[in-house]
């Protein structure tokens, strides 16, 4: 499928589609969140998506198929973001990787991961809710392994995964 995919930076007009895709992707997990733990907050906020698109601190990429966004990724290797997530310098932290349900298991997520510039990186890091088994399986198949080192409270609801570059 790679030959028909277009990887590009998003524009302001993409924010609405990206937001809806994020909302659709996370909505199944919001209904099972009965925990009051602040460590299990899934944020669905259009302003956050706008930040990913507009702020230079983030790398944001979209994948298009036939002029339609099939998936997108946002992350950063900037100190400001890495320190906020407890990551070491030299990492790239994935804030979001979202694939439209119609395009899952078709290589879109892997295509997005390959779009991350690897220069001077030591690892790619992502946090995902334990209940999102589909995401965990995707990351494991992509070479990510579960890592420890954060608070015990974090690991009650989330898992951190890392892949050496």
Positions of PLM-derived features:
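Conserved acetyl-CoA binding element of GNAT-fold acetyltransferases
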Residues: 84-101, 127
């Amino acid at each position: 499928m790679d030959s028909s995919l277009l990887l590009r930076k998003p524009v302001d007009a993409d924010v609405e589609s990206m937001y809806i895709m994020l909302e659709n992707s996370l909505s199944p997990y919001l209904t099972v969140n009965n925990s009051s733990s602040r460590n299990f907050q899934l944020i669905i906020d259009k302003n956050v998506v706008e930040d990913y698109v507009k702020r230079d601190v983030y790398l944001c990429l979209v994948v298009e198929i036939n002029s339609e966004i099939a998936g997108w990724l946002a992350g950063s290797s900037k100190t400001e973001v890495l320190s906020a997530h407890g990551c070491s310098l030299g990492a790239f932290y994935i804030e979001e990787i979202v694939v439209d349900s119609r395009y899952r298991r078709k290589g879109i997520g892997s295509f997005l991961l390959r779009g991350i510039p690897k220069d001077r990186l030591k690892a790619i890091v992502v946090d995902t809710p334990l209940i999102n088994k589909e995401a965990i399986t995707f990351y494991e198949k992509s070479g990510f392994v579960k890592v420890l080192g954060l608070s015990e409270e974090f690991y009650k609801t989330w898992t951190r995964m890392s892949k050496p570059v």
